[in-house]
Amino acid sequence: MTFSQKTDTDVLLIGAGIMSATLGTLLHALEPSLRLTMLERLDDCGLESSMGWNNAGTGHAANCELNYTPQRADGSVDISKALQVNTQFDISRELWSHLVTTGAIPDPRAFLHPCPHMSFVWGEENVAFLKARHAAMAAHHCYHGMDYSEDPAQIAQWAPLVMEGRDPAQKIAATRIITGTDVDYGALTHLLVGHLKTAGLDLRYNSEVIAIDRGDDGIWTVTFEDTVDGTRQQITAGFVFIGAGGAAIELLQKSGIPEAKGYAGFPVSGIWLRCDVDAVAARHHAKVYGKAASGSPPMSVPHLDTRVIGGKTSLLFGPYAGFSTKFLKRGSLTDLFGSITASNILPLLDVAKDNAALEEYLIGQVFQSRHHQFEMLRQFFPQARRADWQEAVAGQRVQIIKPDQGDPGGQLEFGTELVAASDKSLVALLGASPGASTAAAIAVHVLQTCFADRLTEDGWLPALRGALPSYGIDLITDAEACSASRKATAKVLKIDNIDA
């Protein structure tokens, strides 16, 4: 990838959420002279899925999320996906530590707080699963220090609200690791964008992209409209990153690149229950994840969480999944229909045919009564009072429907994926899970995909290792490097660590 002074900007970031902010931050660290421009359709950064109350704020390290550790037919548990997510979060920790050390982020407490991560289950079958899961995870250095208990008294010390009022005859089990975190990704986005703005970022709010065109010279021309007065402008760029959350699929389609053919989006909405009562929130300090219902999407795993947003501690429970045809929380009900094309209609229909259990689950969630929703909370918090809780709408999650290779059908993917132009001059990030926690790892993937020629010893590599000391090291297999990374980042970020 080479840049030209013929363009208005070197790098154009579409969307002002955590993904664009992280990629922009990393690019600036590697080459401060790069001209960066960011376009955002709303009037501030981080207002969609990055905003504090639009996501769970879990520093997803696959400590407690049971959907990352499926059980095999023989009863053993596969932790390979969990290890991948776990070490991807280490990359985020290293980048944040670098930003704190260099003064770009003055205080990590502005967005990050230590918070134990727990898994909690009930019933003989689920207890057996959690015990097998703990045995597999605790044996690996990445999960050193993870505790397991079936003792109600011990679990009550870890999470008193979960145990008070619970049937003493109920078979229960929990795991706990103290190295977990609660992250306000909205606050982090503001910190990153503010840092980039100080460094020269051309930031344009109220700017909605309406066209993305590539010229014969390979230069991209992006047309955007002022959402306040309706005026239109154009900007040329050598490299375009589409990090617009749920809207990324539509923007990718506007680019016209052949690689986008067949891709579609499947939106899933969510609702939280939120408690701002100080006396209640003060008695729960953990993120407690349970087991998802059969057929439910990964982001629907129920959990009772400590949240710290704007300096205030609250509790969150959910999410309750739902369906909306919007691709963004502040989007349009026509988003899904407008994204249907001749190339993706067959993959969409194929996915609809093959995912009856998911569709049945979502329909059930949509028509679920408030009483039923609250009873679900009481499975985690038996003595919860209805008056203490209010509903809050989560950000939209748009899952990937991708074409089958050599087949007109499609498949539903619960994850994230980069779709890049053949010349690597444009790339879009699709998908939703695990999302913000792996933003730094995704940014590194963008570098490897689109800027491989610059990742050399006389190019960006020295600066990249300065920002991410573990770059090029497999923390899953290198226990010593993993321990060293976590010890160093825990100290800088003021979070808990367990020495190996």
Curated annotation (Swiss-Prot):
The keyword Oxidoreductase applies. It comes from the Bacteria. Keywords: FAD, Flavoprotein, Oxidoreductase, Tricarboxylic acid cycle. Its EC number is 1.1.5.4. Pathway: Carbohydrate metabolism; tricarboxylic acid cycle; oxaloacetate from (S)-malate (quinone route): step 1/1. It is an enzyme of class 1 (oxidoreductase). It catalyses: (S)-malate + a quinone = a quinol + oxaloacetate. GO terms for molecular function: 2-hydroxyglutarate dehydrogenase activity; L-malate dehydrogenase (quinone) activity. Pfam families: Mqo. InterPro entries: FAD/NAD-bd_sf (IPR036188), MQO (IPR006231). Its cofactor is FAD. One of its GO terms (biological process) is tricarboxylic acid cycle. SUPFAM superfamilies: FAD/NAD(P)-binding domain (SSF51905). Belongs to the MQO family. This is Probable malate:quinone oxidoreductase. It comes from Azorhizobium caulinodans (strain ATCC 43989 / DSM 5975 / JCM 20966 / LMG 6465 / NBRC 14845 / NCIMB 13405 / ORS 571). The lineage of its organism: Bacteria, Pseudomonadati, Pseudomonadota, Alphaproteobacteria, Hyphomicrobiales. The gene is mqo.
